[in-house]
């Protein structure tokens, strides 16, 4: 970043030479008062401190008015940074961050706090304590970010949220709209709903962690490459408590409606009913790429109701389950008409199945260079149906493409249902005999799949 301090020093020196005394000595008159001079001076101011507007970080005083005054002052000056120093700031209402304004706390990276594990409560740094809106998801978000507005370096903690289920509903913590708003380097410790992105483009959520209880992040009407990077949802606040179980049965880590060219890099969620959910809203559905998108201990790591024709592309992801028999890594619903593709991903359990595909006739699901492990014999399935559904991947609708993958368990690998439109299963390696079951009415290509002998037999033959 360019340093302008030396310029300011020289400028001050020249202004001193041009003082009224010097001008008079040179036979020059000072210019008349400029009515716009005050406005220009205000524009040169780039930083405001909330303490100068009456904010008190004692954990009890309502700071809604003081913060909004500081934010509005920055907005009136056409942008700048509003600083919230160390303190625990309580709020009874909502904040609106105007265009081109940054609300900046003390943290340089997302902090970490826990109540049930380490009793490390959010007592230091810049901590926001919202209290308004309890009892309903409706209503204004706690922090509203307009075009080019930024929230950075804070911890948001709801002090009145209870540890017993069900949790108290609140509106979203952050609403992002317009172009290029951002949430950076922050912790959303225990919101009911975390971040909502809508009606704009180039939104940026980077280096954000926490434990949203109901919905972590919701994206819809994002028309120009919304970006998520290093977003990490983990139950720091209530791990292994009844409320944590409520979250597992009811929560969703990420929800994507209409988002054009979505980018998601190194995202993670743990302990949700659904990790990544893709839906079709009135505005449309999603397409984009998800690299390093991981989900663990979810009933469905990825659930696709529908996606856009141009595909949702997963690469280098890991999907793990610990709660059979309800759980599975991937479920594609019967309304999906788009393409869902996984490359270089790992799926492991224990689980009843890794993937259940029920797509529309024009839907497509593809796996390439993936690893599958730890799917059992589907104990909850009716006995007469187990042969159809107990394979690792059950493909019932749309088309399926499975190439270059590894299946590590000695159980059936793939079932191809009668309503499939097309299937290619080729060049895969199985750590047991090849067991691909088909009831397809259409032609399928199933070839060049290698079944390995049991590992213990291989060791025995080597010893002989």
Predicted regions span which residues?
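Leucine-rich solenoid repeat scaffolds
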Residues: 418-460
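Feature marks extracellular polysaccharide-active and adherence modules
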Residues: 85, 98, 104-106, 152, ...
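Short glycine/acidic-rich loop motifs that flank beta-strands on beta-rich extracellular proteins
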Residues: 79, 92-94, 112-115, 134, ...
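Extracellular beta-strand-rich solenoid/capping regions of secreted or surface-exposed proteins
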Residues: 68-76, 89-104, 110-152, 157-180, ...
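N-terminal secretory signal peptides and thylakoid transit peptides that target proteins
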Residues: 2-21
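Acidic Gly/Asp/Thr-rich repetitive segments characteristic of extracellular carbohydrate-active
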Residues: 50-85
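C-terminal segment of N-terminal export signals and the immediately downstream linker at the start
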Residues: 27-52
């Amino acid at each position: 970043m360019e340093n302008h301090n030396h310029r300011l020093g020289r400028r001050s020196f020249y202004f001193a030479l041009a003082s009224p005394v010097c001008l008079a000595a040179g036979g020059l008159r000072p210019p008349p008062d400029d009515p716009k001079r005050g406005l220009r001076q205000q524009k040169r101011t780039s930083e405001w401190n909330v303490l100068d507007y009456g904010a008190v970080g004692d954990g009890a005083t309502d700071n809604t008015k003081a913060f909004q005054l500081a934010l509005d002052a920055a907005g009136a000056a056409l942008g700048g940074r509003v600083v919230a120093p160390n303190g625990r700031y309580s709020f009874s209402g909502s904040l609106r961050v105007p265009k081109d304004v940054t609300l900046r706390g003390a943290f340089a990276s997302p902090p970490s706090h826990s109540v049930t594990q380490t009793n490390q409560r959010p007592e230091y740094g810049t901590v926001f304590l919202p209290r308004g809106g309890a009892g309903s998801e409706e209503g204004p978000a706690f922090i509203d970010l307009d075009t080019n507005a930024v929230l950075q370096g804070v911890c948001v903690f709801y002090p009145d949220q209870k540890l017993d289920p069900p949790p108290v509903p609140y509106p979203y913590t952050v609403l992002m709209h317009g172009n290029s708003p951002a949430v950076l380097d922050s912790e959303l410790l225990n919101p009911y709903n975390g971040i909502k992105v809508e009606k704009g483009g180039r939104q940026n959520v980077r280096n954000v962690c926490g434990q949203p209880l109901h919905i972590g992040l919701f994206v819809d009407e994002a028309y120009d490459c919304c970006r998520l990077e290093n977003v990490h949802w983990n139950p720091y606040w209530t791990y292994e408590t009844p409320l944590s179980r409520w979250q597992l049965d009811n929560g969703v880590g990420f929800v994507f409606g209409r988002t054009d060219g979505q980018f998601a890099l190194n995202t993670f969620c743990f302990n949700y009913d659904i990790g990544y959910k893709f839906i079709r809203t009135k505005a449309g559905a999603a397409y984009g790429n998800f690299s390093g998108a991981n989900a663990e201990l979810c009933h469905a790591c990825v659930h696709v109701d529908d996606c856009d024709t141009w595909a949702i592309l997963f690469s280098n992801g890991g999907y793990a389950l610990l709660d059979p028999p309800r759980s599975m890594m991937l479920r594609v619903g019967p309304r999906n008409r788009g393409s869902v593709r996984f490359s270089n991903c790992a799926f492991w359990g224990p689980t009843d199945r890794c993937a259940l595909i029920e797509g529309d006739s024009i839907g497509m699901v593809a796996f390439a260079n993936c690893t599958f492990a730890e799917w059992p014999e589907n104990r909850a399935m009716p006995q007469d149906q187990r042969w159809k559904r107990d394979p690792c991947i059950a493909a019932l609708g749309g088309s399926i493409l499975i190439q270059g993958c590894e299946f590590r368990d000695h159980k059936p690998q793939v079932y191809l249902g009668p309503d499939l439109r097309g299937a290619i299963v080729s060049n895969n390696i199985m750590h047991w005999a090849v067991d691909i079951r088909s009831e397809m009415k259409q032609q399928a290509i199933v070839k060049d799949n290698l079944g390995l002998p049991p590992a213990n037999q291989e060791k025995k033959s080597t010893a002989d």
